[in-house]
């Protein structure tokens, strides 16, 4: 387990046994897949220098992703090839416009995203989802997203 502030993944030594990484102000994630091949959980907070998340695709053992405050990310990569991924939390990603979410194994989803992004999330693309929570914020339209999941999985508001 490693918690670090201001990480540049280029400067990491190879940490083949690291399973949990929590980063604040991540500067670059490009080499995380090479340096941390067994990473199972990653949480990235307040990292405005991150422009894309393609490096997540190299983290083949990921079970959990938490992203909060990545204010300059505009699109999420397609994570459907991360077969071990069962939990995802996305919050405060104000520029996020594209979120291709189809994932067979995802069981838990926690979201605080703009309605335009949330509106594209449909139950059929998440066949094993057990729990979804959405922060309604001031946009009451976000509740419509949750309505789609009622009767399919546990629904929560935060």
Regions found by a protein language model. Give the residues of each.
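Concave beta-strand-loop units of leucine-rich repeat
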Residues: 1-13, 17-51, 55-74, 78-158
């Amino acid at each position: 387990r490693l918690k670090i502030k201001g990480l540049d993944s280029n400067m990491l030594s190879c940490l083949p046994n690291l399973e949990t990484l929590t980063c604040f102000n991540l500067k670059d994630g490009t080499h995380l897949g090479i340096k941390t091949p067994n990473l199972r959980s990653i949480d990235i907070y307040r990292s405005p220098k991150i422009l894309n998340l393609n490096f997540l695709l190299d983290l083949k053992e990921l079970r959990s992703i938490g992203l909060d405050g990545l204010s300059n990310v505009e699109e999420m990569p397609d994570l459907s090839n991360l077969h071990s991924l069962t939990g995802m939390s996305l919050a405060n990603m104000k520029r996020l416009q594209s979120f291709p979410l189809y994932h067979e194994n995802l069981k838990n989803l926690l979201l605080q995203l703009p309605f335009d992004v949330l509106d594209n999330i449909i139950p059929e693309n998440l066949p094993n989802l057990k729990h979804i929570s959405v922060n309604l914020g001031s946009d009451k339209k976000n509740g419509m997203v949750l309505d789609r999941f009622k009767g399919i999985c546990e629904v929560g508001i935060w």
